[in-house]
């Protein structure tokens, strides 16, 4: 049986040439595939170097694996260093490793950001959980959870010129430079704006409640005095052009009487039941800075910017006595020690003491805080709080004088200061248009200071009281000492000596 042969034989010359061409094409294809494999191998090795892997050791002792690339004649440089040199190989390896390490580090940082942030968050959460056993963290958590002892800060857009607590309710009045009065209900958790009363066309310089809290009195740069009914929120009485000059201060004597003082040194006494002033006296030439009286309300005292303390007899409606002039502004005052002592603060930071009824010249002088004093309020019968341009509220013991420490702080000069009816809460406003509250109930536990007691004036002036937002450095070391003492007590035990 005849079988057809499909394979070509090399007997024919043309057929042999065709076979040789096919073999050449096959060999070329195999060489190209090997080159591609070697290129992929080199790329993988470069990626490993970029990721920080060490450079493979290509010393002459290493065995040939059949995948090493052959240098091209086109890249040959007769002036280049011998590639077989160990030194050049080490240098190349070091450069490649450092460059690859830096690049790979950056690449890992960029690529791992999302997952890295999650891992960091988880680590932080775990750290917080573990840190709850630490003394410092526990103290911080306790401070955060500790209930507030004073109302939060009140912030206004307008400059606050004066503040005043209501005698019976948890309400504070804030007078502003545009002539409005804001009434806030305060609480340790939050403050609530009750209403805003538009009372004056110019800056409201002083605001006071009557003793029974029924009426709100205000005086202004517009020379008027306004009386507002707290229940109806309506105007009760208007004393239009009460003074010929801008009114600077106002003082309530009782439920009916009040006094005012202006920028030109005029003092007037008013009765809410009448339309006109009871009397007026012009014994001074400069601004009346403050007016006050004692519980008997027989004498009305006035301090002025021209350095005089002037006393008026209310019943006789005339001046009682005027002090010797001082070369500084007398800015504020308070009555202490059972109405037996009058203390006056000055623009030079001094505190002058007068025996009651003897107002011609001071009987004692205390250098004070070495910073202008513009405000003073009695906290107890022997403790005063003073404030001024340095932004600090300081407590002072009266007769004998002692700096008790810093009650509170503002970032800017303090403009007004007041204490509530039970003497436990102080409010202060500053040039930053803010009102801050300070719980000073701890003053009830302060004992009386004797004249012969030793004290450190430098430390006292910088000491921070419990209401202050700053702590004392000594408190930190005191806590450390206490912890060390507790550790020593815990480590101590019965003796094992025979």
Swiss-Prot record:
Gene3D superfamilies named among the record's database cross-references: YVTN repeat-like/Quinoprotein amine dehydrogenase
Keywords noted in UniProt: Repeat, WD repeat
Location of the region described as Disordered in the Swiss-Prot/TrEMBL record: 1-133
PROSITE patterns registered for this protein in UniProt: WD_REPEATS_1, WD_REPEATS_2, WD_REPEATS_REGION
Entry's Gene Ontology BP terms: defense response to Gram-negative bacterium
InterPro entries named in the record: WD40/YVTN_repeat-like_dom_sf, WD40_repeat_CS, WD40_repeat_dom_sf, WD40_rpt, WDR55_POC1
UniProt feature, compositional bias: Polar residues: 114-123
Biased composition (Acidic residues): 12-23, 31-48, 83-95
Positions annotated as WD repeat: 155-194, 199-238, 242-280, 283-322, 325-364, 409-448
Family from the record: Belongs to the WD repeat WDR55 family.
Name recorded for this polypeptide: WD repeat-containing protein 55 homolog
Source organism per UniProt: Drosophila erecta
């Amino acid at each position: 049986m005849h079988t057809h042969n499909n394979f070509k034989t090399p007997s024919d010359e043309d057929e042999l040439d065709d076979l040789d061409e096919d073999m050449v094409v096959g060999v070329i294809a195999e060489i190209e595939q090997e080159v591609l494999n070697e290129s992929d191998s080199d790329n993988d090795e470069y990626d490993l170097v970029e990721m920080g892997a060490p450079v493979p050791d290509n010393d002459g002792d290493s065995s040939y694996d059949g995948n090493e690339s052959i240098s091209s004649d086109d890249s040959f440089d007769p002036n280049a260093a011998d590639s077989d040199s160990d030194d050049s190989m080490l240098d190349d390896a070091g450069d490649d490793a450092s460059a690859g390490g830096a690049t790979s580090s950056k690449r890992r940082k960029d690529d791992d950001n999302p997952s890295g942030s999650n891992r960091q968050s988880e680590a932080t959460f775990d750290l917080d959980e573990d840190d709850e056993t630490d003394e410092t963290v526990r103290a911080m958590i306790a401070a955060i959870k500790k209930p507030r002892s004073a109302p939060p800060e009140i912030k206004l857009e307008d400059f606050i010129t004066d503040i005043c607590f209501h005698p019976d309710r948890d309400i504070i009045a804030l007078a502003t430079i545009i002539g409005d009065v804001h009434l806030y209900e305060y609480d340790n958790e939050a403050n609530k704006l009750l209403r805003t009363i538009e009372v004056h066309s110019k800056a409201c310089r002083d605001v006071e409640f009557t003793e029974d809290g029924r009426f709100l009195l205000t005086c202004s740069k517009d020379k008027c005095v306004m009386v507002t009914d707290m229940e109806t929120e309506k105007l009760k009485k208007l004393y239009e052009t009460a003074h010929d000059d801008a009114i600077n201060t106002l003082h309530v004597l009782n439920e009916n009487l009040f006094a005012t003082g202006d920028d030109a040194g005029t003092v007037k006494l008013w009765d809410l039941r009448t339309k006109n002033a009871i009397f007026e006296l012009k014994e001074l030439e400069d601004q009346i800075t403050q007016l006050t009286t004692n519980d008997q309300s027989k004498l009305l005292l006035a301090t002025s910017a021209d350095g005089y303390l002037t006393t008026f007899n209310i019943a006789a409606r005339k001046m009682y006595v005027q002090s010797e002039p001082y070369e500084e502004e007398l800015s504020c005052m308070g009555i202490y020690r059972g109405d037996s002592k009058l203390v006056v603060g000055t623009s030079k930071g001094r505190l002058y003491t007068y025996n009651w009824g003897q107002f011609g010249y001071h009987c004692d002088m205390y250098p004070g805080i070495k910073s202008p004093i513009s405000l003073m309020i009695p906290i107890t019968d022997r403790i005063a709080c003073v404030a001024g341009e340095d932004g600090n509220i300081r407590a002072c013991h009266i007769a004998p004088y002692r700096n008790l420490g810093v009650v509170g702080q503002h970032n800017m000069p303090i403009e007004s200061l007041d204490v509530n009816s039970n003497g436990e809460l102080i409010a202060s406003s500053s040039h930053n248009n803010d009102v801050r509250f300070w719980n000073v109930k701890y003053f009830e536990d302060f004992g009386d200071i004797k004249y012969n007691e030793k004290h450190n004036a430098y430390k006292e002036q910088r000491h921070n009281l419990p209401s202050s937002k700053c702590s004392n450095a000594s408190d930190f070391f005191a806590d450390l000492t206490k912890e060390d003492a507790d550790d020593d007590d815990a480590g101590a035990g019965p003796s094992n000596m025979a």
